[in-house]
């Protein structure tokens, strides 16, 4: 029998509904309210007493009035999952917004579900090969790990995201879910068309809750994307989950918390900040079936890393990839800062002794080169000691060899994209560190894949 209540109060995105005493809907249940031709979905957030439940709307509440009928759906919001979602664009409710017709999905999953049990989780740390040299060498990603992607506007966050989607699709046969949380509509639009042009759209599901949507939708859209990713993982796939931007998830939660009348905590954030973040992040993990590796763009308010929002996010991250404007300004892409980026699995017990030693030596040389920059600027390279001059020669070659042509940027750069296996990456940097290529011109190292391409390019330069 259907359970119908009446709307008794509407305050912005908050809708209070009265039900019969014995039929109160559960917390997180979806409620459907018909307003004219539209159907508005809200989610139960609180039981207030007097048989009234307080719900948060996932859509605009324009047109809602007291006395309207509200139907308890009897379960949380459910979204389509499985193969039919690939290549499609969804809103937070799992409704397609790409004007390509209905999604013919056989399965739907609730967006609220517990994290995998300890017995199901995979505990063996394993490296996830991205084919991007600077990431694989300096700050490797863990399979089933969580990675923070830090960077300002225009330094290449989106290009790295697209290349990762491209590489996991082509090299690993894996799938991706991109979740835009509180993003600018224009950026989501650009990403959708760029993905269509680069051909990676068919291995990707996109979910957007844009900036102009109510806080309920922006708070829950990350769960919609995660639910789609979890289904692929449980089918034995390795999935990439992109969340852009994880700060907007916290921000939307703060708005919802204030609307529900909770007393704010530090810096005005919700008192449940750590719980909300934990309930999302704990579901992003590897199981014995497959893995979800999550790359999350992190906005840092006023560049204050101690702000509760980024500080709470950091506790969950396994690796950080920091994009630097100063590196992009000298024309080296991807503009990843090798000295600021970190990874928990850059450990000889996980990546092996050789990888660890090469990565440490590369960092050491780049750090020394960074220290020498002021001396070089004032006195020039000729005034340096023989040892420091060698550091400069190798550091400049390493810096350029950390650049790489991307498949998704071929139309802009004119270079064919390269996927570099980790063994090739380690071999290349090891040989540069040993001084084998001190006599090759620096420009031969720029935008190359493996070290063999560098040698070939240098030979061609000599011939011409």
Swiss-Prot record:
One of its GO terms (molecular function) is proton-transporting ATP synthase activity, rotational mechanism. It comes from the Bacteria. It catalyses: ATP + H2O + 4 H(+)(in) = ADP + phosphate + 5 H(+)(out). ATP binds at residues 151-158. GO terms for cellular component: plasma membrane; proton-transporting ATP synthase complex. Signal peptide: none annotated. It is found in: Cell membrane. Its EC number is 7.1.2.2. Pfam families: ATP-synt_ab (PF00006), ATP-synt_ab_N (PF02874), ATP-synt_VA_C (PF22919). Its main location: membrane. The keyword Translocase applies. CDD domains: ATP-synt_F1_beta_C, ATP-synt_F1_beta_N, F1-ATPase_beta_CD. SMART domains: AAA. PANTHER family: ATP SYNTHASE (PTHR15184), ATP SYNTHASE SUBUNIT BETA, MITOCHONDRIAL (PTHR15184:SF71). Belongs to the ATPase alpha/beta chains family. This is ATP synthase subunit beta. It comes from Clostridium kluyveri (strain ATCC 8527 / DSM 555 / NBRC 12016 / NCIMB 10680 / K1). The lineage of its organism: Bacteria, Bacillati, Bacillota, Clostridia, Eubacteriales. The gene is atpD.
């Amino acid at each position: 029998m259907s359970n119908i209540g009446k709307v008794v109060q509407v305050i912005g995105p908050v809708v209070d509904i009265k039900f019969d005493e014995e039929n109160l809907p559960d917390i997180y249940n979806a409620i459907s309210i018909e307003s004219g031709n539209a159907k508005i979905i809200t989610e139960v957030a609180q039981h207030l007493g007097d048989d009234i439940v307080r719900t948060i709307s996932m859509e605009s509440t324009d047109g809602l009035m007291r006395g309207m009928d509200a139907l308890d759906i009897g379960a949380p919001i459910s979204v389509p999952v499985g193969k039919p979602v690939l290549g499609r664009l969804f809103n937070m409710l799992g409704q397609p917004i790409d004007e390509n017709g209905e999604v013919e999905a056989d399965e739907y999953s609730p967006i609220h579900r517990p994290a995998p049990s300890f017995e199901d989780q995979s505990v063996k740390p394993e490296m996830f090969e991205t084919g991007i040299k600077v990431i694989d060498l300096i700050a490797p990603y863990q399979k089933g790990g969580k990675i923070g992607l830090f960077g300002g506007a225009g330094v290449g966050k989106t290009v790295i995201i697209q290349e990762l989607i491209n590489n996991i699709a082509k090299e690993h046969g894996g799938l991706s879910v991109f979740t835009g949380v509180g993003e600018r509509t224009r950026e989501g639009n650009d990403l959708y068309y760029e993905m269509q042009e680069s051909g990676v759209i068919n291995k990707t599901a996109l979910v957007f809750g844009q900036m102009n949507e109510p806080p309920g939708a922006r708070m829950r859209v990350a769960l919609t994307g995660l639910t789609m990713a979890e289904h692929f993982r449980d089918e034995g796939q390795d999935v990439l989950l992109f969340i852009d931007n994880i700060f907007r998830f916290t921000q939307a939660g703060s708005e919802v918390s204030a609307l529900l009348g909770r007393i704010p905590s530090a810096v005005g954030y919700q008192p449940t900040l750590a719980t909300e973040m934990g309930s999302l992040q704990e579901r992003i993990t590897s199981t014995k079936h497959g893995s979800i590796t999550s790359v999350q763009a992190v906005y840092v308010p006023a560049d204050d890393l101690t702000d509760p929002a980024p500080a709470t996010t950091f506790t969950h991250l396994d690796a950080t990839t920091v994009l630097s404007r100063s590196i992009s300004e000298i024309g080296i892409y991807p503009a990843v800062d090798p000295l600021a980026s970190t990874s928990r699995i850059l450990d000889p017990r996980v990546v092996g002794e050789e990888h660890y030693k090469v990565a440490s030596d590369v960092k050491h040389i780049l750090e020394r080169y960074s220290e020498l920059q002021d001396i070089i600027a004032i006195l020039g390279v000729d005034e340096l000691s023989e040892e420091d001059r060698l550091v400069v020669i190798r550091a400049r070659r390493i810096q350029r060899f950390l650049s790489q042509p991307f498949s998704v940027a071929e139309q802009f750069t004119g270079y064919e994209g390269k996927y570099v296996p980790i063994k090739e990456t380690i071999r290349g940097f090891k040989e540069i560190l040993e001084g084998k290529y001190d006599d090759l011109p620096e420009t031969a190292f720029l935008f190359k894949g493996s070290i063999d391409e560098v040698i070939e390019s240098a030979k061609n330069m000599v011939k011409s």
